Amino acid sequence: MTNIRKTHPLAKIINNSFIDLPTPPNISAWWNFGSLLGICLILQILTGLFLAMHYTPDTTTAFSSVTHICRDVNYGWIIRYMHANGASMFFICLYMHMGRGLYYGSYTFTETWNIGIILLFTIMATAFMGYVLPWGQMSFWGATVITNLLSAVPYVGDDLVQWIWGGFSIDKATLTRFFALHFILPFVALALAAVHLLFLHETGSNNPSGIPSDSDKIPFHPYYTIKDILGALLLILTLMLLVLFSPDLLGDPDNYTPANPLSTPPHIKPEWYFLFAYAILRSIPNKLGGVLALILSILILAIIPLLHTSSQRGMMFRPISQCLFWLLVADLLTLTWIGGQPVEHPYIIIGQLASILYFTILLVLMPITSIIENNILKW
């Protein structure tokens, strides 16, 4: 009798995705982040669901409802901090996952890569709206600054901003719709993640060497299930260390002050995982130019497959490209640091140089380096 997991219509899908899936034998720990992202997403949906049971999306009670969750609800504090720090872990895994894709040339699976970019935008939108919900000072002013950027759109900008606000300023209508969208978008992300996997399983996984491994595959279970469990344990350990020892390490103290439209915080800044994009936005003095640079800083990923000029897939055997990749990582860390600094000398010029370098590496230096490396290999 054939095993039920291979015949049952539903079990068959799970079997072909997580059990009998042919997998390259040499994929490293950098391939763990996909499963970790899945765990993060499920964790965020579950903790978010329990938070939504006690949260009230109303400008007068939102802040106190979050306080109530932390003080009065059974284990409310741990749920709240797991949700807040879970978002940070989510973005750490996301950036690692994308870095792996860039380094090893996984972007040559264009459908998988493009779905990934849409997923990134979805999760960034979700995280931004989630930051608004506690209705602290940084929630309110962060939302004001970011939504105001849409007024840079020619002709329809102001109408667009008022349409999103649901009025002439950020108020009850804005908070309510942000809560509704913050609740629904993770489920959209879940569906997109399924499509992401669907396209990935059409081609099979890439591997560190970049050489096709069709002739040499091993089953996903037990080899990679056990490896993923190790990754998951390390993820949960890191998250719980953060939650239990320094839950406010990555947050902003200003968000413990209830939102006040009459008092602007001295430094308005988003959560740490958006600081690199915020630095790029601020590095351009023109409003529309800044907004375009902000969007392009992420959308640039979509043209990476078109700029792939190397005869090799990954960077494993390309030392010059490796140097450029790590320069890009250092540049992004610099941008993250600059995004959290006040707009004054020398931070302005450092931010502008780092922004120029970011686009130069991706658009100019990497394709040229690949061509040079191709020619070196011909000798």
From Swiss-Prot:
Species the sequence originates in: Mirounga leonina
Family the UniProt entry places it in: Belongs to the cytochrome b family.
Its job: Component of the ubiquinol-cytochrome c reductase complex (complex III or cytochrome b-c1 complex) that is part of the mitochondrial respiratory chain. The b-c1 complex mediates electron transfer from ubiquinol to cytochrome c. Contributes to the generation of a proton gradient across the mitochondrial membrane that is then used for ATP synthesis.
Subunit structure: The cytochrome bc1 complex contains 11 subunits: 3 respiratory subunits (MT-CYB, CYC1 and UQCRFS1), 2 core proteins (UQCRC1 and UQCRC2) and 6 low-molecular weight proteins (UQCRH/QCR6, UQCRB/QCR7, UQCRQ/QCR8, UQCR10/QCR9, UQCR11/QCR10 and a cleavage product of UQCRFS1). This cytochrome bc1 complex then forms a dimer.
GO BP of this protein: mitochondrial electron transport, ubiquinol to cytochrome c
Protein keywords: Electron transport, Heme, Iron, Membrane, Metal-binding, Mitochondrion, Mitochondrion inner membrane, Respiratory chain, Transmembrane, Transmembrane helix, Transport, Ubiquinone
Keyword Membrane: yes
Binding site for a ubiquinone: 201
Cofactor dependency: heme b
Additional observations: Heme 1 (or BL or b562) is low-potential and absorbs at about 562 nm, and heme 2 (or BH or b566) is high-potential and absorbs at about 566 nm.
Residues engaged in binding heme b b566: 97, 196
Note describing how the cofactor binds: Binds 2 heme b groups non-covalently.
CDD domains listed in its UniProt record: cytochrome_b_C, Cytochrome_b_N
Protein topology in the membrane: Multi-pass membrane protein
Residue ranges of the TM segments: 33-53, 77-98, 113-133, 178-198, 226-246, 288-308, 320-340, 347-367
Top-rank lineage group of the source organism: Eukaryota
InterPro entries in alphabetical order: Cyt_b/b6_C, Cyt_b/b6_C_sf, Cyt_b/b6_N, Cytb/b6-like_sf, Cytochrome_b, Cytochrome_b_C_euk/bac, Cytochrome_b_N_euk/bac, Di-haem_cyt_TM
Binding site for heme b b562: 83, 182
Protein name as it appears in the record: Cytochrome b
Molecular-function annotations in GO: metal ion binding; ubiquinol-cytochrome-c reductase activity
Pfam families, alphabetized: Cytochrom_B_C, Cytochrome_B
Subcellular location as annotated: Mitochondrion inner membrane
GO cellular component: mitochondrial inner membrane; respiratory chain complex III
